[in-house]
């Protein structure tokens, strides 16, 4: 017996990816096969994982932010959604005609939004930083311009936002199989940080985690191995940083390192390697040796 079935498959965007006819040859007698072991399927509600962070802001006033060069869909929609959620008061800095063109194309409501018209991305970065320096906004958001373009204005000695502490970047990673958000630093600003730079990078990340509701962040200082090796600088830095934390030179967090990536985020891996640590397998913050390795992790 032959069965003919029309067959059509669409992808997540509703586009047809398979179209044809399936011919099935029906067996003439009953066939039994052993049950196959199926992989475990986990459904992760990504928005749910961030609700506790948003919940912390419910009684706070929205803060003014400058959005530098929001000239594509994502960088324009994001601050408008944050405005609608009562989180921010966006100030859009960029070519007004281009911003309005994107808004009209994508149905983004700009009513009541302040737009500062500047000719190009470099002027957007310069103006956004000036607004922050003058206290007109409390935060900066990068739009559709290169990170270097914005950061060159931020770190300018004359007109930037320098403080006594070194600037650093933190990724907030959504890992479905990890029980809480994971902060990764620094994978965007400091290319090859020194030991002194790493002190600032760690302190910045600890204070951010505390602001996010983590009372004593667990900080894993990553390297290729979990033992100190004089030929691997990152292991020496990790050991020194942990001792500096013991001496109060880094405050507010619980540090351990060097730790390889697997035993920083997996209790099973840490136990297998015989690592006894309050940080291993349950880190809140991953401190990477340099920008390259940080980008690979994040």
Segment roles from a protein language model:
Residues 2-45:
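HotDog/MaoC-like acyl-thioester-processing domains
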């Amino acid at each position: 017996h032959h069965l003919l079935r029309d067959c059509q498959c669409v992808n997540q965007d509703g586009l047809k990816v398979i179209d044809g006819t399936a011919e099935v040859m029906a067996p003439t007698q009953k066939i039994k096969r052993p049950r196959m072991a199926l992989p475990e399927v986990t459904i992760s509600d990504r928005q749910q994982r961030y609700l506790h962070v948003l919940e912390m802001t419910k009684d706070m006033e929205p803060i003014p932010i400058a959005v530098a060069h929001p000239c594509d869909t994502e960088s324009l929609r994001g601050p408008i959604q944050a405005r609608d959620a009562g989180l921010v008061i966006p100030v859009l800095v960029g070519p007004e005609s281009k911003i309005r063109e994107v808004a009209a194309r994508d149905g983004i409501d700009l009513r009541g939004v302040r737009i500062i018209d500047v000719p190009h991305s470099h002027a957007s970065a310069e103006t956004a930083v000036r607004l922050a320096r003058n206290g007109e906004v409390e935060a900066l958001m990068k739009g559709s311009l290169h990170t270097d373009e914005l950061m060159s204005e931020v770190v300018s000695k004359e007109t930037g936002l320098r403080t006594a502490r070194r600037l650093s970047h933190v990724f907030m990673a959504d890992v479905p199989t990890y029980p809480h958000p994971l902060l990764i630093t620094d994978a965007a600003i400091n290319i090859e940080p020194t030991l002194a730079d790493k002190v600032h990078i760690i302190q910045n990340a600890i204070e951010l985690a505390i602001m996010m509701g983590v009372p004593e962040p667990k900080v894993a200082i990553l390297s290729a191995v979990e033992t100190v090796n004089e030929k691997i600088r990152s292991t020496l830095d990790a050991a020194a940083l942990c001792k500096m934390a013991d001496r109060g030179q880094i405050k507010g967090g619980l540090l351990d390192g060097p730790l390889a990536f697997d035993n920083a985020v997996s209790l099973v891996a840490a136990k297998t390697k015989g690592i006894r640590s309050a940080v291993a397998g349950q880190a809140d913050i991953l401190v990477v040796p340099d920008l390259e390795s940080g980008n690979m992790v994040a």
